[in-house]
UniProtKB/Swiss-Prot annotation:
Stated name of the protein: UPF0260 protein YE2365
InterPro entries referenced in this protein's UniProt entry, alphabetically: Puta_zinc/iron-chelating_dom, UCP006173
Spans traversing the lipid bilayer: none
Stretches assigned to coiled coil: none
Domain of life assignment: Bacteria
Length: 148
């Protein structure tokens, strides 16, 4: 008899810190800057990545010090997850929180991030470094269909 993986046995609230961290597929979508219209609160998605994001691996170059180095860096937690309505439908935290399973390309199932990059889930193919951008408005993406 095979045992179910932890994400099928536990709620997000029941997961250990290491299980929680392992859910992140490392796509880098959280690390793309968003602009918020001050009048309407509408969120505009950009392809401008935080300078701490390694654009090839889509991993934070200074993960342990990210909040110290980037004051706007967000931390997804079990408590604040519901406030991040802009998370893509591919986000494991969102999927598990909504009662879905992980997609077949997720690194916990595929064994590596290659499938995720191959499916173009990661920002590797669109991201530009924040320090190289003059006008962020020139980098606004069409609003993704999944954005609420």
């Amino acid at each position: 008899m095979s045992q179910l993986p932890f994400w099928q046995q536990k709620t997000l609230a029941e997961m250990s810190d290491s299980e929680w961290e392992s859910l992140c597929d490392g796509c880098g979508q959280c690390c793309l800057n968003k602009l918020i219209d001050e009048d309407t609160d509408e969120i505009y998605f950009t392809n401008v990545a935080c300078d701490q994001l390694n654009l090839k691996t889509c991993q934070c170059r200074n993960y342990e010090r990210r909040f110290e180095l980037e004051e706007d860096c967000i931390k997804l937690t079990r408590e604040n997850l519901v406030t991040f309505e802009w998370l893509p439908p591919t986000c494991a935290y969102r999927l598990i929180g909504e009662g879905h399973d992980l997609p077949k390309w997720h690194p916990l199932l595929a064994g590596s991030k290659s499938a995720m990059h191959g499916e173009r889930i990661s920002v590797r193919h669109i991201a530009v470094r924040e320090s190289e951008v003059i006008d962020w408005q020139d980098h606004i993406l069409n609003k993704p269909q999944w954005a609420r």
